[in-house]
Amino acid sequence: MSYEERANAHPNLGDESDVEEEALVNDYREQVNFDDGMSELDRTTSLGGGSQTQDLQAQLAAAATPLEYQATLETKFASYDNYCSLFHYILNSDGPVELEVPSYYWAWDVIDEFIYQFESFCRYRNRVARSGSNEEEAQLLRENPNTWGCYSVLNVLYSLIQRSQINEQLAAIKRGEDPLAFAGEYGSRPLYKMLGYFSIIGLLRVHCLLGDFSLALKTLDDIEMNKKAMFARVMAAHFTTYYYVGFSYMMMRRYADAIRMFSHILVYVSRTKNFQKGGNSYDAIAKKNDQMYALIAICVALHPTRLDDTIHSALREKYGEQLNRLQHGGPEALPLFEELFRSACPKFISPTPPDFENPALNVDPVDHHTAIFMDEVKNTLYNPTIRSYLKLYTTMDLKKLAGFLEVEPEKLRSWLLINKQRSRQVRWVEGGLLEGEPVNANDLDYALENDLIHVSETKAGRRLVDWYLRNLARVY
């Protein structure tokens, strides 16, 4: 099959056919069955042989191995030095490093662990600076401000992407052209291609942790978000990608797109969970699974919409009571919004080292982004109550509605204007993840003419044919 035919065979983002879903599930089953308990890195073989290649294999194996939970500060410093040495050798050797690798897993493990150690070190450093309780560690951190620095980590990821020319290769695949024509001397090697590819997913994660959600989505411009993508072949990478894309959409108030992303991966996980058990990443995936259901509950409360039956049932089972409270709105829902957000959001980090001399000036990045999100929630607190009244009328006097709500008419007018503005969302149709068209996100619309509210409502009928087909498949 030519590259053009393969490109045309790729489904678009909205393609959710059962045949392709089943194919991906079967592919994942094969991956699990193939794993005989040995690490993928243990099966790595060398093209060149010799001690130098064996040393590189050992370094890659160490880079993919999680650091101990209670690792000392000196161990974290040493781990950073080891990563620097490894990536310097890969990126700056005279010519590409000759190493053949058998699978995608090892490259994801290396990038994933690299970013996890960066994230955990930043949180630890911020915690030491804010507490001021351990002067010895604070002094060590003060003397080494560039260790696990944001610039260093981003430089590694961007360098791996540039060296492998992976973006050019992905763009060529989109155009139906041969990616090897754009790969260059380095990008044609699996070592560089895989590290470069998963560095793109790593950039998505890092930019999201830093709070730059637009740039996070921008990094995936050349990656097709479908079941044929390379990241979809590694369960942890598949899950991570959709989690951070969905969360970025949520923070940009694109709730419909966030729900679509979360729903896609949660449906997939529900179909593969029986043979995930026992895998190394099962516990982490199960935790992220619960977090995404919490985020869907938040999104549905802020943007009422119909969910897939599988997602809706699981959501009711996990967060039924909380979802009802969120959907009713009002001041009493604020603590619950904050609780769910804190439990499900990424562990944000600061791009700069903390101020060790003035601990009180250091702000927890999670607190900072939670406050930003809660400001948005406060703007929409009374939307459910207002909607419940407006649904009863086609026209209504502003002062009459203000009397029902026991608020000043001008305050109600500002609420209505905010709600009207929030109901217009950008929704993805095609192209890059940042692209989209503004649409009215609610089934209830209204217009203000002086003090008269004109209300219109559109109701989408339930697609009974799809419902019957899904349930017949379960029975038979």
UniProtKB/Swiss-Prot annotation:
Organism superkingdom: Eukaryota
GO CC annotation terms, alphabetical: eukaryotic 43S preinitiation complex; eukaryotic 48S preinitiation complex; eukaryotic translation initiation factor 3 complex
PROSITE patterns: PCI
Species assigned in the record: Aspergillus niger (strain ATCC MYA-4892 / CBS 513.88 / FGSC A1513)
Subcellular location per the Swiss-Prot or TrEMBL entry: Cytoplasm
Keywords: Cytoplasm, Initiation factor, Protein biosynthesis
Record's protein name: Eukaryotic translation initiation factor 3 subunit L
Family, similarity comment: Belongs to the eIF-3 subunit L family.
InterPro entries in the record: eIF3l (IPR019382), PCI_dom (IPR000717)
General function of this protein: Component of the eukaryotic translation initiation factor 3 (eIF-3) complex, which is involved in protein synthesis of a specialized repertoire of mRNAs and, together with other initiation factors, stimulates binding of mRNA and methionyl-tRNAi to the 40S ribosome. The eIF-3 complex specifically targets and initiates translation of a subset of mRNAs involved in cell proliferation.
GO BP term, pick one: formation of cytoplasmic translation initiation complex
Transmembrane regions: none
